[in-house]
A protein has these predicted regions:
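A detector of single, family-specific signature residues
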Residues: 1-391
């Protein structure tokens, strides 16, 4: 058995190679983060091993820094283990009382961790390509949050420039309102528009939903508006709406790419009422290979949804707060999906109502429903069977 620990960094990687006896075959080699460095590492591994040797390569999950070297190792057929940094930190502290942490020490710790035969599962080629879906879903998540902040800015600016408008439309964030404000961002400008022009603008943007009556209503409100005349805010509002439109176009493009992958996967969890394409994609992308998890509880822990526990002597915590460690994207996807599932699925709606009847806070009851949903998702994905709605 040959164990290779790699401490990943931005510009260089530190490597340590141990054999099954714990003897150092190559101590703390430093390679640059480029193709020459990767080839140097591969050659060093070949020089230190025989064809009959079983090889394990371990590295920490360091996000985008580890992505390229991970792909190189997998392409060259080396069994690679991606380890949670929390685990390596705890393991290193268990080996020594000294607070020594260097790249070389980390590389040796990872190699020793592999040698100790702790319960680790190798990173599969399927998991590597699953990163494509994860990249898309996380990218969409960030874009949606960015757009939400811009929408808040629109609401703030409208409150300053034309506060009466919000009561005349179902939402400020609809095509007809954006079309109006992108051309006439203030109440004073809207009040001076010719009625025919305003009617045509609203009718075109709303696809016929709004006509002359709505145009008169908006123009009359603009003429008596308390909105301020601030050219700087006018410009900010027009630019903000432009950015929202661009982000919406980008999000639509991302969703098309996600849809293509999900059409190929056709996962069983889509058969659960209330689970949509985007939510399912994020859940699957963050969990990855379900065989890496022995039980649904492991997935909950990975998402940081498990209750934290604290006990010392006679002291035991009365209110177990959520751990909130692990993937925040998975935690977000699970909780938001649970809300929709509880709305559309009678079984989950009844379960949520039961927990609420027991006196639990809504968020606590929802966390119980989330655990139930994770158990269902785990069962469906492991069995490959679709969800059957009870008659």
């Amino acid at each position: 058995m040959i164990c290779i620990g790699i401490d990943v960094a931005k510009d260089k990687h530190d490597c340590c190679i141990l054999d099954s006896d714990g003897t150092i075959r190559a101590d703390c080699i430093t390679i640059p983060n480029n193709m020459d460095g990767f080839k140097q590492l591969l050659q060093t591994i070949r020089d230190c091993t025989k064809k009959s040797d079983k090889i394990k390569v371990g590295l920490e999950a360091t996000g985008h820094y580890s992505y390229n070297i991970l792909g190189f190792l997998l392409d060259n057929g080396l069994p690679t283990y991606v380890i949670n940094p929390l685990h390596t930190n705890l393991y290193r502290n268990s080996l020594s009382l000294r607070k020594t942490k260097t790249d070389r020490v980390d590389a040796r710790t990872i190699a020793t961790m592999l040698l100790s035969d702790v319960d680790l599962k190798s990173y599969t080629d399927t998991a590597y390509h699953n990163e494509e879906l994860k990249s898309l879903t996380r990218y969409r998540f960030d874009k949606v949050r960015e757009r939400a902040k811009l929408k808040q800015s629109v609401s703030r600016l409208v409150t300053i420039l034309f506060p009466e408008l919000e009561k005349l439309v179902p939402s400020l964030h609809i095509a007809s309102v954006y079309a109006l404000l992108s051309e006439y961002p203030g109440a004073k400008q809207i009040s001076e528009i010719h009625l025919t022009k305003l009617t045509n603008l609203l009718a075109t943007a709303s696809k016929g939903r709004y006509g002359k009556d709505k145009a008169i209503q908006i123009r009359d409100a603009a003429r008596t508006s308390i909105g301020s005349v601030m050219p700087a805010k006018f410009l900010e509002l027009k630019h903000t709406i432009k950015l929202i439109r661009e982000l919406t176009s980008e999000i639509d493009e991302i969703e098309v790419s996600i849809q293509k992958i999900m059409d190929e996967l056709n996962p069983p969890i889509l058969s659960i009422p209330g689970v949509g394409i985007q939510s399912a994609a994020m859940i699957l992308a963050e969990i990855g290979d379900f065989s890496n998890f022995e039980s649904p509880d492991k997935i909950l822990a990975y998402a940081g949804c498990s209750p934290s526990t604290y006990q010392s002597g006679k002291l035991t915590n009365c209110y177990a707060h959520m751990e909130k460690r692990g993937s925040r994207y998975l935690r977000y996807a699970l909780y938001n999906t649970t809300k929709y599932v509880c709305h559309w699925n009678p079984v989950f709606a009844e379960y949520l109502a039961k927990k609420r009847a027991e006196g639990k806070h809504y968020n606590v009851a929802l966390s119980h429903a989330t655990k139930k949903l994770v158990r269902l998702i785990y069962a469906l994905q492991k069995s490959g069977k679709a969800y059957l709605v009870a008659a």
